[in-house]
């Protein structure tokens, strides 16, 4: 009987051992070939991917970084090392963690790691632990500007670039501000060679063109506004305030002098600035500003248009004298000049006996050439030179002179000056407004 009890106990123990052995084998078989490392299990890896789809993993990452992330690029696209997937994975002692992309972490055997790296199958070996990150300065949580690194990857800040360089041991530098790729730097604008100072000839030509323009405006004004016998006295200018040049230049000066201080300030001169078409207009008026105060007085304005060397008839006479060199030029035409150096209205050729009419620049008037003497009306304008104002008056002054009567014994008109009232000025302004000039 005792022997039977011993055999029964032994049989029960053997059965228990068999059951436990099978249970352990079943557990071992479920672990797969990687014995004991559940992190290498495919089911666990799929769970990591599921976390990514559910947005659990990304909440630990930099939102501003992944906003610009391109999954098609390799992993060395400058992930934030502090958010590396391997930091959350703990491999067995004989394995090391590597990342296959920005969301997948794998535990790989150390003995298989080096051969796979040589073949290039593993993108990058990551840190065994966070010890390498201790020496790198972390970046503050603050909004910053994105930069492009020398490795061709975009970083959310310069600090992130430096952190990545520190943690990986790479030598990185900032190529440009903003995301990669860096746009080519625009070529520095080719500055046009600054225009050299205007020559005296250019200034004289410009002054001559401006005088012609002022003359045309003045002529149109006198043609449109015809003073009548009833309002002539009230509508004429007070000649005592006119500049020293009393032709179209004086008329233009008074048109520009809006505050009637006999000075043209820059705002008043700007009314005739044509920089786009006349690049020398500013140099012209700057050269006339003798006192360098930024304003033109009436004398400076008049002198501005009588630069020496700009007198057409006098220049022609000088040219003829140089050609003759003391010899008599028989049969040659010799022009007639006035005291200001411009052409007289009537010109005659002594050899042919023909006469014709010209303007002050010597241009012949069409149909005026005749055999013998011709009657040419003298110009109503002079060059604007000093002293020329006494011989020529404005058209509206001529109408006024006809009412005053004959000249005195010395041939001078008897002019009675009177003060200009505010009502007279208002009437004159109203007439000017009706014309509608465009300066």
Curated annotation (Swiss-Prot):
Give the disulfide map: 86-97, 91-107, 136-166, 139-159, 148-180, 313-337, 348-355, 357-376
> May I ask which residue range the UniProt record assigns to the signal sequence?
1-21
* Thyroglobulin type-1 domain segment(s): 310-376
> How is this chain modified after translation?
O-glycosylated. Glycosaminoglycan that contains chondroitin sulfate and heparan sulfate.
Intracellular or extracellular location(s): Secreted, Extracellular space, Extracellular matrix
Keywords on record: Disulfide bond, Extracellular matrix, Glycoprotein, Heparan sulfate, Proteoglycan, Secreted, Signal
GO MF terms listed in the record are: calcium ion binding; collagen binding; cysteine-type endopeptidase inhibitor activity; extracellular matrix binding; extracellular matrix structural constituent; metalloendopeptidase inhibitor activity; serine-type endopeptidase inhibitor activity
Q: What is its main location?
A: secreted
Give the record's glycosylation annotations as residue positions. 228, 383, 388
Q: Which CDD domains match?
A: EFh_SPARC_TICN1, KAZAL_FS, TY
Superkingdom of this entry's organism? Answer: Eukaryota
Q: What protein am I looking at?
A: Testican-1
**UniProt source species:** Homo sapiens
The taxonomic lineage of its organism, from the top, reads: Eukaryota, Metazoa, Chordata, Craniata, Vertebrata
* Gene encoding the protein: SPOCK1
């Amino acid at each position: 009987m005792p022997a039977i009890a011993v055999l029964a106990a032994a049989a029960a123990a053997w059965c228990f051992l068999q059951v436990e052995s099978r249970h352990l084998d079943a557990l071992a078989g479920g672990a797969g070939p990687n014995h004991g490392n559940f992190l290498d299990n495919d089911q666990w890896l799929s769970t990591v991917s599921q976390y990514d789809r559910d947005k659990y993993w990304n909440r630990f990452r930099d939102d501003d970084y992944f906003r610009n992330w391109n999954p098609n690029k390799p992993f060395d696209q400058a992930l934030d090392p502090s958010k590396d997937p391997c930091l959350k994975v703990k491999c067995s002692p004989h394995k090391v963690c590597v990342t296959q992309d920005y969301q997948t972490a794998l535990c790989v055997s150390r003995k298989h790691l080096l051969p796979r790296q040589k073949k290039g199958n593993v993108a990058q070996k990551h840190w065994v632990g966070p010890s390498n990150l201790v020496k790198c300065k972390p970046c503050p949580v603050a909004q910053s500007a994105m930069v492009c690194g020398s490795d061709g990857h975009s970083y959310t800040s310069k600090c992130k670039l430096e952190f990545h360089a520190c943690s990986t041991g790479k030598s990185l530098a900032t190529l440009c501000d903003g995301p990669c790729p860096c746009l080519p730097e625009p070529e520095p604008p080719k500055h046009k060679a600054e225009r050299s100072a205007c020559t005296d000839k250019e200034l004289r030509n410009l002054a001559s063109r401006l005088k012609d323009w002022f003359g045309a405006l003045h002529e149109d004004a006198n043609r449109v506004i015809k003073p009548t016998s009833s309002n002539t006295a009230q509508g004429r200018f007070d000649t005592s305030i006119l500049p020293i040049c009393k032709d179209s230049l004086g008329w233009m000066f008074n048109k520009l002098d809006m505050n009637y201080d006999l000075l043209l300030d820059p705002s008043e001169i700007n009314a005739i600035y044509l920089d786009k078409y006349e690049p020398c207009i500013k140099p012209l008026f700057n050269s006339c500003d003798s006192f360098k105060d930024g304003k033109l007085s009436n004398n400076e304005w008049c002198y501005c248009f009588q630069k020496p060397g700009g007198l057409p008839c006098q220049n022609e006479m000088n040219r003829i004298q140089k050609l003759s060199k003391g010899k008599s030029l028989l049969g040659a035409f010799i022009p007639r000049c006035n005291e200001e150096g411009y052409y007289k209205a009537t010109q005659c050729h002594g050899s042919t006996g023909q006469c014709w009419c010209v303007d002050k620049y010597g241009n012949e008037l069409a149909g005026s050439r005749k055999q013998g003497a011709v009657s040419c009306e003298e110009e109503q304008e002079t060059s604007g030179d000093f002293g020329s104002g006494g011989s020529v008056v404005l058209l509206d002054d001529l109408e006024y002179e006809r009412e005053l009567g004959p000249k005195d014994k010395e041939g001078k008109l008897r002019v009675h000056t009177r003060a200009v009232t505010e009502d007279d000025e208002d009437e004159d302004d109203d007439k000017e407004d009706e014309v509608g000039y465009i300066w």
